[in-house]
UniProtKB/Swiss-Prot annotation:
InterPro entries: ATP_syn_F0_a_bact/chloroplast, ATP_synth_F0_asu, ATP_synth_F0_asu_AS, F0_ATP_A_sf. It is a multi-pass membrane protein. Keywords: ATP synthesis, CF(0), Chloroplast, Hydrogen ion transport, Ion transport, Membrane, Plastid, Thylakoid, Transmembrane, Transmembrane helix, Transport. The chain crosses the membrane at residues 32-52, 96-116, 129-149, 195-215, 216-236. It comes from Tetradesmus obliquus (Green alga). It holds the Pfam family ATP-synt_A. Its main location: plastid. This is ATP synthase subunit a, chloroplastic. GO terms for molecular function: proton-transporting ATP synthase activity, rotational mechanism. Key component of the proton channel; it plays a direct role in the translocation of protons across the membrane. F-type ATPases have 2 components, CF(1) - the catalytic core - and CF(0) - the membrane proton channel. CF(1) has five subunits: alpha(3), beta(3), gamma(1), delta(1), epsilon(1). CF(0) has four main subunits: a, b, b' and c. One of its GO terms (cellular component) is plasma membrane. It is found in: Plastid, Chloroplast thylakoid membrane. Belongs to the ATPase A chain family.
Amino acid sequence: MSDFLLNPFSEIAEVSVGQHFYWQLGSYEVHGQVLLVSWFVLAVIFGLSFVGNSNLKSTPDGLQNFTEFVTEFIRDLAKTQIGEEEYLKWVPYLGTVFLFIFVSNWSGALLPWALIELPNGELAAPTNDINTTVALALLTSISYFYAGIRKKGLRYFNRYVQPAAFLLPINVLEDFTKPLSLSFRLFGNILADELVVGVLVSLVPLIIPIPIMLLGCFTSAIQALVFATLAGAYIGEAVEDHH
């Protein structure tokens, strides 16, 4: 009886985040599972985009209707966060970031990657790897620096001493905390969702984990929206005129 009671807790103790599948490139080790699943995610996005727009109709239906809805949603998000003057040139970037994170998160929540056997390690959602989320956050940082310098030139750096020069250290620190908060928020939420589902599946394999998985799909979509919204807000802040 005691073994029966203790067994679920021993299974919980064995729940892990997952082992990385490494590729050796010279002296460097690359997380192969991130690249493999990222290619799958990009193939899904490109495939749906191609099929949805290969035979355009004046009255959209089916997949074309869905792709137009997504495009309008991202366009409105960019317009709200960046402003009417600058938003159009940033719709492709925000759309790419949003769709990549969204499909990556859902691939981890819905697809049984652990069932695919590899020589070592296992497949998982790209956003389950801190390297992916940091890379996305750094791309966003580069984007808003580029947006600000492209519009204002070197005057962009005046923001570090506005409205007062003593705020320089705080404004510089803010440029480091933005990518950190973006990357760790996304990584932490996806990691926590996978751990919770893993614990529940080890305790009660049927029925009970399903609502948690559905909740995970919802929070995964929210995380993609939050990341894209904040990316747009940072770009909008960089290009806005300060008087």
